[in-house]
Structure formats: C-alpha cells, structure tokens
C-alpha cells in the first residue's frame, strides 16, 4: 500500500494554445504482434482533448519510482507543441494516461487518474481496480 502526497499546484489552462499535434507514433519496433500497432494507429487526439487532458491531470516535478508505480505504459505516444504562459513546450502524451512537457531545460510530468480522462487513452489509469478495457479502444 503506497500513499502518494503531492503538493497542490494550481494551473489555469485558459491561456494554453496547442500549436502542433503529430500523429500517434508506435514505439516498439521489435513487437511483431500487429494488435498494439493497430491500436496505436487508431488513437487520435484533437486540440480540445489535449487541453482537457492537461487540465484534468496532476502535475509531478519528477518521474519518480512512485509515479511509475501508479501508471502503466503503452508503446504509443502523441507528441506536439504548445504555448503556455507565453512559453513554448514540446509535449508527449503516452497512450496509458501519462504525459510530459519539456522546454529543453525543464521537464514537467503529468498523470491523469480521473475517470473523465479514460475515453481519451488506450490504457486509462489502472488505480480504480481495473486494468485496460476502459478506454475508447477495447482489446
């Protein structure tokens, strides 16, 4: 049993602007099973969904062992660019409900554990007593 305490950081995402969204990218060239690749190819997010993901997500200062213990990982991501508070960030959203922003000097990690995020991911947050199958792409 692990309890994660995070400092609460308030963000107002009214001034976020999505500049670029790349197609989903499958990151497991050695996995010859077409199932995961097909799921990844079907996964699409638009600008309003990306804004919603970040507005619902919790922010983490580092990718700690504790954070990685709470979320799964899937070999699929959607990357792009955004501006927040007049600062340009590269973002990467993993299909298993985690994300990160980087400006080359600083990296911010995100995890979306709220049910409102589930339909936007292939593998939603597993901490509510299920693993997989809750996203919009059913196994």
Regions flagged by a language model, labelled:
Residues 1-8:
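Bacterial N-terminal signal peptides
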Residues 12-14:
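Boundary at the C-terminal end of the N-terminal hydrophobic targeting segment
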Residues 24-40:
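Acidic/histidine-rich, surface-exposed loop or edge segments in extracytoplasmic proteins
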Residues 38-97:
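Mature extracytoplasmic domains of secretory-pathway proteins
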Residues 92-99, 113-118:
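A short, sequence-level motif marking secondary-structure junctions
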Residues 104-139:
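C-terminal partner/receptor-binding element of secreted or periplasmic proteins
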